[in-house]
A protein has these predicted regions:
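C-terminal catalytic core of tyrosine-transesterase DNA break-rejoin enzymes
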Residues: 217-262
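Basic, Lys/Arg- and aromatic-enriched nucleic-acid-binding interface segment
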Residues: 96-124, 247-250
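Conserved tyrosine-mediated DNA breakage-rejoining catalytic core shared by Y-recombinases
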Residues: 128-172
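The alpha-helix within a helix-turn-helix
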Residues: 116, 127, 257-258
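N-terminal core-binding DNA-recognition domain of tyrosine recombinases/integrases
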Residues: 1-86
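Active-site/catalytic core of tyrosine-dependent DNA strand-transfer enzymes
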Residues: 163-231
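Short, basic interhelical loop/turn and adjoining N-cap
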Residues: 133-137, 262-268
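DNA breakage-rejoining catalytic core of tyrosine-based enzymes
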Residues: 80-106, 154-165
């Protein structure tokens, strides 16, 4: 689907994600539709109302509405579709710029911020945690994919995928990333990493990270970027993108959930994808 008048790369990606999710829903709910000009405004409104009924925030539904209007050349408004208005008081705690975010200079924490955005790690991994990241925390498989080994909340271990768009920046932060074969089980991965971490010496990647930085915002952005990345990978492999969990592809959500260290897809949708 192509729509004129989109000049922002981020807007393009957001609209594309909405189009993919809407198409998945349409295939299940209205299988007789084969071409775009068969789609009616009523069906688009039905989709938006369904998203709202599933508990998505006003922000998420507000994001979908202009995307469908642009793609399908509709002029749906919230009043017509009986959609809730977005309230300032209900905006999630992690906006792109919060008041306290303005009290620090991002340039002083450029590498830390890049790392957090690229990996979706919690604050404790950047600074202060038992397994605060070291150079040995980051590794690459034989396909060139980069991962970071993390032990965070509750002592849970995971290998989180580094977003492809940050790959070059991560390689600058850690110039000589170890290449290795992943182990067959998560338990073996955890054991190997903890031994490596214990014997690797005291050098950490970062020595400071102000609490004024809203790290949760970076995790939320990581979740959205990672989901989009997985959708694109699945499409590239000719896989079918489903809307089988609250408008999202369940398999892609599961991987995002693992990368975030939750392993609960409802948490991803309710706290990160909005």
């Amino acid at each position: 689907m192509f729509a004129r008048g989109i000049f922002s790369h981020n807007t393009y990606n957001a609209y594309k994600q909405t189009a993919v999710e809407f198409a998945g829903w349409l295939k299940q709910s209205h299988p007789g539709i084969k071409v775009m000009n068969q789609i009616t405004k009523e069906q688009a409104i039905q989709y938006l109302q369904k998203r709202q009924a599933e508990g998505l925030s006003s922000y998420s539904v507000s994001k979908d509405m202009p995307a469908l209007n642009k793609i399908l050349n509709f002029s749906i408004c919230k009043k017509e579709a009986n959609l809730n208005n977005r309230s300032y008081k209900n905006v999630a705690r992690s906006r792109a710029e919060r008041q306290h975010d303005k009290k620090y200079n991002p340039k002083n924490y450029a590498k830390q911020i890049t790392f957090a955005k690229a990996t979706g790690c919690r604050r404790e991994s950047v600074l202060g945690g038992q397994y605060q990241v070291k150079p040995c925390s980051v590794w690459r498989d034989f396909k060139g994919n980069i991962f970071v080994s993390l032990v965070e909340k509750g002592g849970k271990f995971r290998n989180a995928s580094v977003l492809s768009k940050y790959k070059e920046e991560i390689e600058k932060i850690i110039p000589n990333i170890t290449v290795r074969m992943p182990y067959n089980s998560l338990a073996m991965e955890a054991f190997h990493f903890k031994e490596l971490y214990r014997t690797s010496g005291p050098k950490y990647l970062f020595s400071r990270y102000t609490k004024k930085i809203d790290n949760h915002a970076f995790r939320a952005q990581y979740a959205r970027d990672r989901y989009e990345e997985l959708v694109q990978q699945k499409m590239g492999q000719r896989g079918e993108i489903l809307s089988n969990y609250r408008g999202y592809d369940r398999d892609c959500l599961r991987q995002v959930s693992f990368d975030l260290g939750h392993n609960r897809i409802n948490v991803v949708v309710e706290h990160y994808m909005r």
